[in-house]
Amino acid sequence: MKLSWKTLLLWSLPIFVVGFFFWQGFLGPTTTDVGSNIASSRMTYGRFLEYLDMGWVKRVDLYENNHTAIVEAVGPELGNRVQRIRVELPASAPELITKLRKANVDLDAHPPKSTSAVWGLLGNLLFPLILVGGLAFLFRRSNNASGGPGQAMSFGKSKALFQMEAKTGVVFNDVAGVEEAKEEFQEVVTFLKQPESFTAVGAKIPKGVLLVGPPGTGKTLLAKAIAGEAGVPFFSISGSEFVEMFVGVGASRVRDLFKKAKDNAPCIVFIDEIDAVGRQRGTGVGGGNDEREQTLNQLLTEMDGFEGNTGVIVIAATNRADILDSALLRPGRFDRQVSVDVPDFRGRLAILEVHAKNKKMESKVSLETIARRTPGFSGADLANLLNEAAILTARRRKSAMTMSEIDTSIDRVVAGLEGTPLIDSKSKRLIAYHEVGHAIIGSLLEHHDPVQKVTLIPRGQARGLTWFTPSDDQSLISRSQILARIVGALGGRAAEEIIFGDAEVTTGASNDLQQVTSMARQMVTRFGMSKIGPLSLESQGSDPFLGRGMGGGSEYSDEVATNIDKQVREIVSECYKEAKKIVKDNRVVMDRLVDLLIEKETIEGNEFRHIVKEYTAIPEKNYYISQF
C-alpha cells in the first residue's frame, strides 16, 4: 500500500510526541554537569557546617548557581577516607564563602553550560510548536476539503462555472437535427450581439428559454452552441448544486448567481436539469421540501426581478417539463419552451454527417441508409453508434469502417452484446421457427413494417431476433398498423403451436405477450379503437409523488372495466387466429426458411422476401434498406 506524505506525517506526529517526552524525561540534557559528580551520599547543610568547623572539609565545588555543592571531606566518621558528599545549599548563605576561605578550603564555582540552556529552551518550545503546527495543518486540510468546517462561510456562494469568454468549442454548425430550435435561439444570439435592433422597435427579448426533450437529444449541446456563437460571459450550473444540507444555502446561491450575472451582463445563465430545483411546490406523499421550495421561490423572484433589457438570459434544460412548477413557466420567467425531440430522418442524417467528419469510412458506406435504419435514435445514440463502429473497426484491424461494422454496432446498441451461437438442437430449430413466424407474418401483412433481417445469433437476453424497420418516421399510427403489429408479435407463439403442438409452446413469447397486451389495452382505453367507442378510459395523472391521483378511485364503473378486459381479449384472440392461419397457409416456405436460417444463422430482409415471393405474393411496401 502506497502512503502519501500527509498520511505519514499524521501517523508520525503521535510517535514523535511520545519520543520527545521519553527523551526529556530520561535522556535529555541537564542544565549543569553536576550529574557526573554526584556523590553516593548526601548530608544536610547544618551537618556540612559542623564538618567545616571541625576542619574535615577539604574541597567544595559549587553548581547550579550555588544551589548545589559537592563536598570532599575526610574524618573519623567517614572512615578516614575521602568521601564525595552532595549538599543542597540554601538560597541565601552569604557567610558560607567567607567561612570556606577562612578554613582554606579549595573552592570552585561551575557556571551553567551555554549548550544546556539552548537545549532547555528548545525542549520547552519544541512540543508546543509541533502541536500548534499540527493543528494548523489539520485545520487547513479540512478548510480546503469539500464540505469542511472552513466552507461554512462560502456555502452561500454560487458554484456556477463562469467563463468570461465562453470557450465551449461548440457553434451552431456543430449542432444538427434540431433546426427549429436553432432558429429560435438565433434570435437570442442576435439580441446579445445587436440588442439595439430589438429595442429600437420596442421589442423585449425573452428572459428565459426552457429546453424540453428526451435525454440525449442535444439540449446541453445547444446551450453550449448559443454561448459559443454569442461570445458573451457564460454561467453554467446544475439544478442539484443549489441545495445543500444547510437551510438557506440554496436561496443564497441563487442570489449570488444572479448578482454575478448582472455584474457581467450581457451574459447567459444555463441551468441544467432544472427539475431538481423547479419541481412543483407542496406536492408528494410526504409534503413539500421546505429548503427546495425556498430555493425555487428565490429563483422565481430573481427571474421576475430583472429589468427589461439587462442582457441576462436564462436558459434551462429538462426532460421532465410536466413536473415543473407552473409559476416557473409563465411569461416573464421562462417565456418560451423549445422542444428538442428525437430527430427525424433528415435530422439523423445531419447528425451522422457531423459525427462522421472525423471517422474513416469506406466510400460504400451510406449515411442515408444508416439514418433510415435508426428511427428513434437520439443524437447521443447516433454518436455512440459511430463510436462503437470505430472501436469495432480497430478491433478487426481495419483501416476504415464498413457497413458490416455499422450493422453490428446497431445490433449491439439496440439489443446488447452478441452471445455464443446456439448449437444444432431441437431448441435451435424451435427458435428458428419462432423468428421465421414473426418475419413471414410481417412480410405478408400490408400494414406491417418490412423485415430488415432475421438472426439466430443471441444478443442480450434474446436467443434470436427479428428486426423490422419502419418505412418512415411514424408520428401517427393507424388502427390497421396496430393490429398488424399485434398479429406479427403473436407470430412466434403461433409458429411454436402449429409446428410443435400446444404442449411444446415455450416461454420465449413472454415479452411478445407483454407488448401485445399493452397495445390492445391502449387501443381500448386510450385510442378509442374498440366497440366501446371513442372514449378515453385511461387514468389521468396518476403520479402520487407529484400529488396526483392520491387516493383517487377508478374513473369508470366495474361494468366498464369488465367490458375493457373483454375487448382486450377479443382483439388479441382475433389477431392470434389470423397469425395461426398465416403460419398454416405458408408452412412450406417456412420450412425452407428455417433450414436456411439454421445453416446461415442470419437472413437479410431482401433475401428473405425473395424466397417468400417464390411461394406467395407480398404486398407492396417501401423497401429502402439496402442489403449489407
From Swiss-Prot:
Transmembrane segments: 8-28, 119-139
Residues that coordinate or bind ATP: 213-220
Keyword ATP-binding part of the UniProt annotation: yes
Cofactor binding annotation: Binds 1 zinc ion per subunit.
Database matches in Pfam families: AAA (PF00004), AAA_lid_3 (PF17862), FtsH_ext (PF06480), Peptidase_M41 (PF01434)
Location, primary (coarse class): plastid
Single GO molecular function: ATP binding
EC number(s) recorded for this UniProt protein: 3.4.24.-
UniProt-listed Gene3D superfamilies: 1.10.8.60, 3.30.720.210, P-loop containing nucleotide triphosphate hydrolases, Peptidase M41
Active site as annotated: 435
One GO CC annotation: chloroplast thylakoid membrane
Enzyme class: hydrolase
Family classification: In the central section; belongs to the AAA ATPase family. In the C-terminal section; belongs to the peptidase M41 family.
Oligomer status and interactors: Homohexamer.
Protein name per its UniProtKB record: ATP-dependent zinc metalloprotease FtsH
